Amino acid sequence: MAATEPPSLREQAEMDDADNSEKSVNEENGEVSEDQSQNKHSRHKKKKHKHRSKHKKHKHSSEEDRDKKHKHKHKHKKHKRKEVIEASDKEGLSPAKRTKLDDLALLEDLEKQRALIKAELDNELMEGKVQSGMGLILQGYESGSEEEGEIHEKARNGNRSSTRSSSTRGKLEITDNKNSAKKRSKSRSKERTRHRSDKRKSKGAGEMLREKANRSKSKERRKSKSPSKRSKSQDQARKSKSPPLRRRSQEKVGKARSPAEEKMKSEEKGKIKDRKKSPIVNERSRDRSKKSKSPVDLRDKSKDRRSRSKERKSKRSEIDKEKKPIKSPSKDASSGKENRSPSRRPGRSPKRRSLSPKLRDKSRRSRSPLLNDRRSKQSKSPSRTLSPGRRAKSRSLERKRREPERRRLSSPRTRPRDDILGRCERSKDASPINRWSPTRRRSRSPIRRRSRSPLRRSRSPRRRSRSPRRRDRSRRSRSRLRRRSRSRGGHRRRSRSKVKEDKFKGSLSEGMKVEQESSSDDNLEDFDVEEEDEEALIEQRRIQRQAIVQKYKYLAEDSNISVPSEPSSPQSSTRSRSPSPDDILERVAADVKEYERENVDTFEASVKAKHNLMTVEQNNGSSQKKILAPDMFTESDDMFAAYFDSARLRAAGIGKDFKENPNLRDNWTDAEGYYRVNIGEVLDKRYNVYGYTGQGVFSNVVRARDNARANQEVAVKIIRNNELMQKTGLKELEFLKKLNDADPDDKFHCLRLFRHFYHKQHLCLVFEPLSMNLREVLKKYGKDVGLHIKAVRSYSQQLFLALKLLKRCNILHADIKPDNILVNESKTILKLCDFGSASHVADNDITPYLVSRFYRAPEIIIGKSYDYGIDMWSVGCTLYELYTGKILFPGKTNNHMLKLAMDLKGKMPNKMIRKGVFKDQHFDQNLNFMYIEVDKVTEREKVTVMSTINPTKDLLADLIGCQRLPEDQRKKVHQLKDLLDQILMLDPAKRISINQALQHAFIQEKI
C-alpha cells in the first residue's frame, strides 16, 4: 500500500492543477459563466466553496463533462481515504517519502493560494481596466504588448500540435514506455515545484499584505459593477467559447482512446498550463498592484513561456528518439503539419509567420540583455540539470523539431514576396554552419523537397544515395504530397507560377528575375556547389534517358504492340520522373527559346529537306488518300490568314456600296450579324484598319495599326452582333484575362489579349499580331508531307506548356486543332488561340458534338464525363497531322470516329463503355460495337455488329511513310510514335498526363 500511495497522490495533485489552471485560462479569456456571475457575492462570504462553484462551469454540461466530474468525485473520495491511511501509516514511512509527502501537501496549499490570488487579479482585470473583450484587445495594443496576443496564439497552436503529435505517437508506443515517460515527467515536475515553493517562502510578508489590500479593493469594485456590464461579459463568454477547447472536446469524442492514454494526455495538458501560469503569477500581482503594465515584463513572460515550451519539446523528442529510432522526428512533425486542414493555416498572426523562432530569439536577446538575466534566474529549466552531452543532444533535437516549421514558414508559397526580400539579409546572419549541419540535412521534410529553390536541386544527388528502403519511403510520401497539392485549388498553383524562377529565360525582365532569385530562400551561400551538382545531375538524367530510349526503340520495332511500354517499366519511369515539374517546365521553355534562336530562317529549308526524303511512289498514295478524306478546311476557318487579296476582300463584302440593302438594322452589320469591314477606317479612335484576315463562326478578324502605341500592329477580332455570339465573346474575354494574369511572363504559349472595346455594338478584342495558323502552314509548306521532326518537337513542347497553363487555370479549351494554333513570322513560336468553346472544368456539359469532329476524344462521343484529357487527345491528333500532313481520324460521323479510334487501339474497355450516356447509339446490350455504314450500292445504312476489334492501323508505318530517314531522325520518329501511343489511349484515366508528356524522351532529347 505504501508503495503505490505516492504516485496516486501525485496524480491527484496534478489533476487538481490541470482543472484549476484550465479554469483560470477560461477566466483570463473572459469566459465568465452564468453560475459564476450569480454566485459572486456568496463566494466572497464563504471562501471554502470557491473550488466547488468553479467546477460548475456550464449549466448544461455535456455527457463527457459529467463523466469526468463523476471520476473526479471518486478520486476525491479515494484521496480522503488515502489521507486517513497515510496518517496511520506515517510512522512506518521512510524519511525520504515523508519529505516527498510534505512537499506535496505544501504544493497543494500553495496552489490554493495561487488560485485565490488569480481569481482576485482576474476580477480586477475584468472591471477596473477592461469593460469588454474588445477593450482587452485594445488595451493590449496600447500597452505595446503585441507579443502577448502572439503568445496566446502560440500557446494555443503549441497545445494543438502537441496533442496531435502525442496522439499519433501514443498509438505507436508500448505501455511500459508510457509509464517510464510518466515517471520522468513527474520527477521533473516535482523538482520544479520544489524550486517554486522555495521561492514563494522567501517572499516577504509585506507583499502578502499588499495582496490582501488589493483583494479588498477589488471586492468593493466588484460590488459596484453594473449588471449591464456583467451581462455583456456573459454574452461574450458564450460567444467566445475558445476554439482550441472546442476542438479538443471534439477530438475526445472522435477518437475513443484507451484510458491510460487519456490520463497521460490530460496530465500533460495540466502540466503545460501549470508551467505556463505559475511562475508568472507573483510577478503579475506585483505589476497589477502598481497598475503599470510594462511591455518589457510582457516580453519577459513571453520569453519564459517560449523557452519552457521548447525545452518540453526537446524532452519529448528525446524520449521518442529512444523509443523508435527508425522514424525521424522531422517526418513526424511534417506529417502532422500536412494533415492540418489548410483553412486553419492562414489564421496565424502575420508577425509570427515572418520571424523564425531562432531569429526572434536573437532579436529579443539583443533588445534586452537585462531581461535575459532576469529570465535565467526565473526559469529553472530542466535542461540545465542535464549533463552537457545530453543538453547538446536535446538542443540538436530541438533544432530538428523546429526545422520543418521554419521551412514551412519560409517556403515561397506561404510567404508574401516582399517579406522574402526583407528576411534574406537576416537569414544570412543565421549561422551558415548550422544551416548545413548534417542533422539538418537529414531532417529535410517532404515539403522542403518540393520547394523550388536551387538548393534542393543541388542536394538531390546526395539524396539519391540513401538506402533503397528510405528512398522508396520518401518517394511514396512525395507522390502523396503531389497528389494532395494537385487537389488543392488552382489558386495556389497560379500564385506559384508567378513566384517561379526561370533561370534560362533571356527575357526583358531578367534583371528583375535575378533580384528575385537572390532574395528567395537562403540559396546565396553555395552557388559553386550547386553548379557542380547540377552538372552531375544532368549527366545522370541523360544516362537514364538513354536507357529508356533504348528500351522504347526495341518495343517500337514491334509495330503491333500498342502501348504497354509506359507501365512496363515502373522503376525507370519513376527514376526519370524525379525532377520537379517546375524544373521540367524551365527546361522545356529554354529548349523552345533555343529552337527559336537557331531556326529563325530555316523553317522552309527543313520542310524542303523533308520533301526530298520522300520517294516517288508517295505521290500515288497521297492522291488516293485525298479522295478518302476531303479537306473540310479549304475555305472555312481561316481566321488569321497571312495574305489577303482584293478578290477575297470583295468576296467578303468589303468596300461594297452601303446603300445596297436599306432594310438592314445598320449599314455596318450584314444580315448574319458580321461587321462590314472598311479598309482605312479607324476603330475606337486609335486602330487604323489596313487589312482583312478572314471570318470564323463567331467573328471576323482585321489587321490594324495602333496609333496610340507607335503604330504597333494588332489583330482585332470583331464579334458578330447577336446575343449568343456576344455571350460567347464575353466568355472568351474572361478566359483570356484569366490565362494572361496567370502567365505574366508569357511562357505558356496562349494568345495575349491586349484590351477590348465596343464598336457599333460589336464587341472587339485586340490581340497580338500573328501571321498565320498551322492549317495554313501545312497547306503552304507541308501539303501531304508534313513538317520537319524538329519543328514538330518544338511545337509539341509549346502545346504541352499551353495545356499546363490551361490546367492551372481549370480551363478546358475544347477546340484544339491546327486552325486554332497561330505561329509567328519565323514559324518558331506558336500560340493557342480561339477560346470561344472553352469552359471551366467543372461546367463540362455532356454533349456529343463538343470539339471539332476529327479531334474529338472518344469519351465525348460516348457521353462519359470528361476533363483535361480531351485537350490532350486533340493535341495528339494535331501532332500526328503536323508530322504527316494527314488527318489522323477523318471520321464522317461520331460512329465512324469510334471505329477509326478502335482500329488504332483495339476495342474500347467495357468499364468505360458502361459509363457512357450515349453508349446505346454505338454499342448493343452485350457491349459489342455497332458499326453503322452506308452501303455503296443501295446507299442505305447498314449495321455491322463487331464483338472484337483488333488494332489494324500501324502508326509507325504511317509516320515514316516512304521517307528514307537518317538514323537520328528515325530514332526521333520512334519516340514520337511512342508518345502518340500514350496520348491516344481510349480510356482517359490511362492517358498520359501533361507532366509525363513533358518528361517524355521525344520532348526532352534534342535532335
From Swiss-Prot:
There is a cross-link at residues 100, 112, 118, 171, 178, 593, 659 (Glycyl lysine isopeptide (Lys-Gly) (interchain with G-Cter in SUMO2)). One of its GO terms (cellular component) is kinetochore. SMART domains: S_TKc (SM00220). Residues 40-60, 68-82, 180-203, 215-231, 304-315, 342-367, 438-497 have a biased composition (Basic residues). The active site is at residue 815. Residues 518-535 have a biased composition (Acidic residues). Phosphorylated by CLK1. Autophosphorylated; phosphorylation inhibits interaction with its targets, such as PRPF6 or SMARCA4. The modification Phosphotyrosine is found at residues 141, 849. The modification Phosphothreonine is found at residue 385. The modification N6-acetyllysine is found at residues 100, 717. This is Serine/threonine-protein kinase PRP4 homolog.
